[in-house]
Amino acid sequence: ATPKHTADEHALQRMIEHYQALSSLAPYAPTTIGCALDPQQVVGYAERLTVVERFRDPLGDLIRAPREQAPLLAYFRNNVLHLFALPAVIACLVSHNRDLDAARVAQAVAGICSLMRAELFLRWSGDELAAASEAIIRVLLARALLRHPEAEGRLAAPEPISQEFVELRLLGETIRPLLERHFLTLALLERHGSGHLTRPALEDNCHRLAQRLSLLYEFNTPEFPEKVTFAAFIGNLIEGEFLHETEDGLLHFDERLLTPLAHSELVLSVEARQAIRRMARAGGAA
């Protein structure tokens, strides 16, 4: 999640503390079992597994994930992503908008999770999702990763120059590649319009534009441009009845798909949104 896959050891241990607090105080499920190791021990364990390496530095040791370990670490992340997907979505929402009405946060979380539910096998119903979100927000407030501004009923990010703001952004980074894939797919559908693309054509367009994004911008997670991930998401959209495939093979949709698209814009940086929109326009004109 960090630039160049490298982190200051102290900062890394702080992030581990945040994850452990979320796992303990707002667990994904009652059966969730947290890690009994403290953050320093977790880092040491990862070193022994050789999935990270240490660089000694007078200003503080750096911990880095070697390039050759990136596919393995992506696999590790994807295996546990459902556990922290909801905190990550909330972190993305607030860190990229600075100050949001709490009701808007709840609405956006519900819309985004409706798209992620099948892909990540998320367990919550509508009411359960609201309760889980509130529990997570309480933990993030207690850890100063969120704050209540003066206006009642709003949520705000920490000050941009603070360490807490950096940590909130890092928390959101875990879900960013998935959200970017979703936004690219929805933006392409919106660009072409209902009833103009077949499923294979949409998969090909997503794959081709994702490859280009990976080369031009910082869309550099190993699995971001993989065609199979887009194919799976499009299949989930059809199963969830966000898309309807007619006998002639064309994909149709209505405002039920455009509403999550609007919500998805809230969780990405301006740079990511603009890059994806530009590529979607280019793909639509091709």
Task: Give the ranges of each region predicted by the language model.
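Membrane-interfacial terminal anchoring regions of lipid-handling membrane enzymes
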Residues: 1-286
